[in-house]
């Protein structure tokens, strides 16, 4: 039975994580690491309270009121993070109603992959996750807090916040989202405009107009990429107030949900983060990822998060869970609908309700919504509403309101989850199958090897790629150049696919959570910088990518005995040299110390 199989997966993870999990918990709850404001010197305490309202200084300084940290990713350029501007004031005001207070302990950086996509700044993107984790730790290192709020939404921000928060797992913690922007132009129309521009059918001004109709307001992008997959995972891990992920920023309900976050932390009922996040909650996040067709980036981030609390998750677990969990949602790029339409027809509450009903979720996982009378994931089968200005929760719908977007377990879009692990003589890689049509899931074609994204785009522009081929792009892994997303290739590969050509991508780099219809074997491990087999591929090699059978192979008899393609010898020799420009040289030590994609691509030495 599926439930038994999930239990077996959990037991395997628990067994392999026994020593690392025990060590993590021992360190986190060591008496030396607990909040110590009452034992600080008077001068130290005065520094804590100096900027606070006068009437709060003595109560907080003498620990007669709870004092919570706010770690915020606010900036006012990025649409998803602009709404966080007023959250600290909302939280502080609500906490004072409950004899508590909060301070903004730290800001963390928040960069947008949508801005740097295809440009050199993207090489900082993955490492920004680890910088965010470090920045979170700096903010909490004053060690005077009783708990913490984490304000963040987008791609590397939420994983970075959670990795940092788990270093302070003795604190009760709540994650607070901002929600998606209201719907603009349909995502498929935006994608078509990009392809039309790539083919020279529309000009730059026409494309810009379409893009601005898509990205037009505050909130996250409305497609189901990494940012919105983050929000899903926070729900499935029980770190959000229930079903707060996909409420638009300017909806009056959003303010009330922020206030509810403050109430939950002030209640004293929220467990320390280290006790709340365990094998069950991590597996629940993975189950949610598969059931909704979420972002490939979480084959990195969820592993890094798990290892940060002593849980050893690996790609085999992703494969095993994918075999058990049906695909219940079709949200762009997996379908044409956006997350607002997904929310309107039942949303995460319906997905969780369905999975629980069929025994496909760990119901007894701890959450921030746990109370003495109601514990576990059942709290997340309810949807928030405003009635007379008050927050009320009602049971999720029993039936999807649009089965083109959301379906029950009994009638899924597919029997298996949205992500798979490919294996073969190139190593192991990740593919997102939920957005790929059946007729494109197997590609057998000759390789064209590229040194850079720019070379690919130039050759496409010159009409040199109008044929069946597998694009091979090595040295895009974490040790090579920080593992940038290669989403800019999607438009061009998609255009070639629409012209009737059989095309695919093989790379040790990443793709955006928005990437979809072209079969792409990504995160290939070992990567090129570790002399992975990808560096042996030559132009003209016959490659077979078979997503239905989880296989990726070079079909050349001499392949296993080959050396490195001479095209890349100079690249290998220069790997330890810093890349200059846009601050990339400052990240050289992170790049040289990063572990593998299968280990989460972490750069600060967590060895779990």
Regions from the PLM with identified roles:
Residues 136, 140-161, 174-176:
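A short, small-residue-rich loop immediately preceding and capping a beta-strand
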Residues 1-76, 80, 89-108, 119-121, ...:
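Catalytic or ion-coupling anion/metal-binding cores of large enzyme and transporter domains
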Residues 105-143:
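N-terminal small/polar loop signature for handling phosphorylated ligands or for N-terminal nucleophile
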Residues 129-136, 143-147, 457-468:
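Contiguous domain-boundary segments centered on the initiation and propagation of an alpha-helix
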Residues 86:
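Acidic/charged coordination and interface sites in well-structured regions
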């Amino acid at each position: 039975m599926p439930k038994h199989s999930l239990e077996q997966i959990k037991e395997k993870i628990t067994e392999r994580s026994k020593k690392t999990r025990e060590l993590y918990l021992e360190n986190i709850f060591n008496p030396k690491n607990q909040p110590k404001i009452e034992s600080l010197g008077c001068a130290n305490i005065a520094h804590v309270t100096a900027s606070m309202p006068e009437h709060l200084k003595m109560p907080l300084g003498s620990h007669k009121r709870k004092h919570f940290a706010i770690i915020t990713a606010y900036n006012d350029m990025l649409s998803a993070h602009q709404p966080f501007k007023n959250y600290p004031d909302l939280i502080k005001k609500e906490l004072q109603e409950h004899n508590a207070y909060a301070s903004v302990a730290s800001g963390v950086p928040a960069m947008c992959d949508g801005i740097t996509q295809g440009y050199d700044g993207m090489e900082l993107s993955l490492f920004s996750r680890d910088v965010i984790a470090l920045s979170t730790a700096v903010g909490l290192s004053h060690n005077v807090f009783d708990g913490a709020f984490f304000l963040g939404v987008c791609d590397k921000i939420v994983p970075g916040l959670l990795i940092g928060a788990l270093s302070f797992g003795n604190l009760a913690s709540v994650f607070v989202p901002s929600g998606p922007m209201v719907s603009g132009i349909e995502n498929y129309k935006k994608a078509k405009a990009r392809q039309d521009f790539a083919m020279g059918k529309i000009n730059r001004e026409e494309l810009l107009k379409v893009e601005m109709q898509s990205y037009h307001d505050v909130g996250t992008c409305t497609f189901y990429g990494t940012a919105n997959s983050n929000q899903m995972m926070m729900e499935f891990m029980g770190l959000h107030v229930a079903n707060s992920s996909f409420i638009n920023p300017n909806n009056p309900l959003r303010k009330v949900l922020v206030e509810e976050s403050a109430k939950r932390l002030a209640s004293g009922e929220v467990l320390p983060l280290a006790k709340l996040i365990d094998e069950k909650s991590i597996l629940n996040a993975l189950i949610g990822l598969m059931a909704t067709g979420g972002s490939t980036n979480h084959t990195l981030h969820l592993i890094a998060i798990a290892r940060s609390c002593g849980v050893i998750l690996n790609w085999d677990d992703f494969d095993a869970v994918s075999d058990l969990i049906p695909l219940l949602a079709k949200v762009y790029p997996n379908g044409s609908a956006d997350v607002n339409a997904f929310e309107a027809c039942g949303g995460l509450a319906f997905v969780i309700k369905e999975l629980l009903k069929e025994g496909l979720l760990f119901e007894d996982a701890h959450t921030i919504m746990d109370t003495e009378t109601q514990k576990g994931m059942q709290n997340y089968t309810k949807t928030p509403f405003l009635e007379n200005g008050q927050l009320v929760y009602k049971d999720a719908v029993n039936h999807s309101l649009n089965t083109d977007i959301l379906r029950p377990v009994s009638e899924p879009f597919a029997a298996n989850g949205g992500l798979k692990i490919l294996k073969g003589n190139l190593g192991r890689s990740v593919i997102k199958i939920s957005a790929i049509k059946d007729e494109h899931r197997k590609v057998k074609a000759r390789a064209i090897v590229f040194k850079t994204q720019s070379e690919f785009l130039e050759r496409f522009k010159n009409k040199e790629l109008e044929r069946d081929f597998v694009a091979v792009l090595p040295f895009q892994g974490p040790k090579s150049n920080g593992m940038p997303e290669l989403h800019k290739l999607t438009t061009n590969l998609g255009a070639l696919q629409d012209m009737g050509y059989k095309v695919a991508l093989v790379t040790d780099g990443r793709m955006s959570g928005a990437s979809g219809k072209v079969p792409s074997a990504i995160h290939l491990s070992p990567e090129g910088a570790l002399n992975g087999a990808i560096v042996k591929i030559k132009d003209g090699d016959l490659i077979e990518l078979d997503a239905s059978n989880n296989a990726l192979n070079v079909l050349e008899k001499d392949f296993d005995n080959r050396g490195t393609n001479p095209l890349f010898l100079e690249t290998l020799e220069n790997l330890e040299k810093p890349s200059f420009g846009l601050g990339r040289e400052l990240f050289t030590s992170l790049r040289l110390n990063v572990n593998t994609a299968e280990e989460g691509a972490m750069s600060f030495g967590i060895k779990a």
